[in-house]
Amino acid sequence: MSYADFLDYWIDTYASFNLHYSTTVSYINIIKNHVKPRIGFYKLFQLDTRLLQEFINKIYVEYSFSKNYMASILKVVKGSLKYACYTLNYINSNPAEHVHAPRIDKINNDPAHIFTQEEIERILDRFKGTHSIYYSFLTAYYTGMRVSEVYGLTWDCIDFENKTLTINKNIIKKNQYGLPKRRNITKGHSVGVWYYGDCKNPQSRRKISIGDTLIKALKEYKKEQEENKKFYGDSYLYYYEKKVLNDITKKEETKLIEAKGELEVALPKAELVFVKDNGQFLGTDSPKYAFKVIHYELGINSRFHDFRDTHATRLIENGADIKAVSQRLGHSTIQTTYNIYVRVTNKMETETVNRFEEYTNSLDLPKTEDKPYLT
């Protein structure tokens, strides 16, 4: 069996059942773009540690991927061959067991961009006429939610009276077989079906507090949405929740069914928060064009996830408790919050110096004596 064929088998029999959907999708992309083209043609028994280490080294040198992405490539190789060796006994030993990513110091190529307040104002001003974008960006900035969590929000998740927001699902796009979304070349956009997905980890299922600014904005948006339903009438798009069985995992999932006008069906209605004026739901595809505008028109090179980075960083630099921030973001550990989302800003650096200056103010420094040959 070739390694390429085995990787397909590993995805179908192991990854799809044991890993989070987004992780499986990222592994499929790694396999397609990097593993199969370079070493997929080898038979399983032909793979050895030297070959795999050279593969990893070349990937690193050619692309200079981040530490996290290199770790993901290694997880694919190590995980798949561990499965082949210890679970299936297809090979006698795991040749990837002692393969490591190159330990070379490199310039930080983290793409994160921490928005300034002026940039946030410019972005919101640019999209004030596109309400689904404006309010979803505002929500992301004020909550630090993941993009799939923001667009997976339904109105029942928002408690206006108690000023809380419940995050209990996300939104993902699949094809009819429950596999990653595909690209429609003729129409130029990804084609698929929207599903509710599980949260990234148990800590990601959370209830967070939100302030008056966001509460007021979402109330206004909800009112506008109700007016849009009346304006579009039978042309307004509604979505319904249908329970289906995943053909691969055999697990029950919730699929969103689109319909023009309200239907008299025994399916619960999906009261999605961020939809176009006519009710159309674009999910996580919604902000893709917007960020091209932000980059090329506003000159801000950023991505949706930077709202999350900014939210965490601004909270920390303004003295918020790190544990509270970690829980708010839905991280599995506090260390994740430190390592990934909290950056040292100029303000934090200045405050650090000032604190030490305050601490040493009482220190009576003796004056240095003049050198005899300088007098």
Label each region the model flagged.
Residues 1-45, 50, 226-269:
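N-terminal DNA-binding module of tyrosine recombinases/phage integrases
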Residues 4, 11-83, 109, 280-286, ...:
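N-terminal core-binding DNA-recognition domain of tyrosine site-specific recombinases/integrases
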Residues 45, 91-93, 103-125, 174-191, ...:
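DNA breakage-rejoining catalytic core of tyrosine-based enzymes
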Residues 63, 125, 129-133, 143, ...:
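Short, basic (Lys/Arg/His-rich) helix/loop patches that form interaction surfaces
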Residues 82-95, 120, 140-180:
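Short, charged phosphate-coordinating catalytic segments
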Residues 105-107, 114, 171, 329-354:
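Catalytic-site neighborhood detector that most strongly recognizes the C-terminal catalytic loop/helix
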Residues 157-164, 300-301, 320-342:
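Short, polar N-cap/turn motifs at the start of nucleic acid-interacting alpha helices
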Residues 162, 169-205, 214, 227-228, ...:
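C-terminal secondary-structure termini that scaffold catalytic or DNA-interacting sites
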